[in-house]
């Protein structure tokens, strides 16, 4: 079966594990005498080959509070690894990313709590997630998780961060625990119709999201709260098509080089001057995308699509229009002659006439009819940035080709 072939590609070898252990030895030496644990997919045995981020959590008594993590704990960790290649990253609170032998190690300060439902910060639940998963998955189950993760990565729905709004690693593990194996997850997902409820434990509150998986270690939390309806739909359709015609294309989509430019495509390249939390930046980018689309439609442009991609510092926004050319003037349709609002319409407009249908009309001048200017004005980033903008002429990179193509390679 194709899944066995995929596993040969994505399952780590003993050599891979030894390499990770060497990196962990360096980290263990630096964090000596601290209360720390290795967490995440490496600890759970569900990690993918050549996709290794190690999570190391340093625990502090819950009584010290969140502010202690952000200052004292963070400084303590930095002092221990400052001679290594490291950067600061930001989520609910700051943490450290160390790069050793091309392996990224996230060192995250957290509070030691009694149970997952007593979590003070989001990361405090992590040890309980690890314990739950390792106690419910055997070796075959871990491979089934690997298949599901790679499938979701291939179709673009993996990652709970705001930029993606997809499935977290923990969500994939719970899906395998609930349904049993990769194929069974796809069989059920192919029949999904939201709202979808998957209950490994009874929920402790009412959830409103389209996909609901109450967290077994904290039933007040929906594990899949971040998953967008678009990604749920994409996963369901991909599952249906894979079951009909299994292909490596779902796991490792091919790169399409040529794609015709349809309509007019505006490219906005943003370079951010400051480092910030990825979720904060992408929250602002998503608002910008929505605002650009609304503004262009309000000014009379026919918008085909607006998308954004990139990382925390370099972001591309692509705006596809039926045409970038729009008239300086437009037909303004007014009320019927018998309407009580005709006097107001006449007062506010010039060049007014009565049409054959008994309705009043006027000619109005657009306040703005340059799409590039409108798009730039509606970027709502709160950090300083440089911008380069141009209308697409040539086929450029894979992301732009993907934007132009629209249809996933696994679908056609």
From Swiss-Prot:
Q: What is its EC number?
A: 2.7.7.72
Q: Which amino acids does the record list as binding Mg(2+)?
A: 53, 55, 106
Which GO molecular function entries does the Swiss-Prot or TrEMBL record give? ATP binding; CCA tRNA nucleotidyltransferase activity; magnesium ion binding; tRNA binding
Question: What cofactor does this protein call for?
Answer: Mg(2+)
Name the CDD domains on file. NT_2-5OAS_ClassI-CCAase
Note from the entry: A single active site specifically recognizes both ATP and CTP and is responsible for their addition.
Spell out the family assignment given in the record's similarity comment: Belongs to the tRNA nucleotidyltransferase/poly(A) polymerase family. Archaeal CCA-adding enzyme subfamily.
Subunit composition? Answer: Homodimer.
| Name listed for the protein in its UniProt record | CCA-adding enzyme
Q: Which organism is it from?
A: Saccharolobus islandicus (strain Y.G.57.14 / Yellowstone #1)
Q: Which gene encodes it?
A: cca
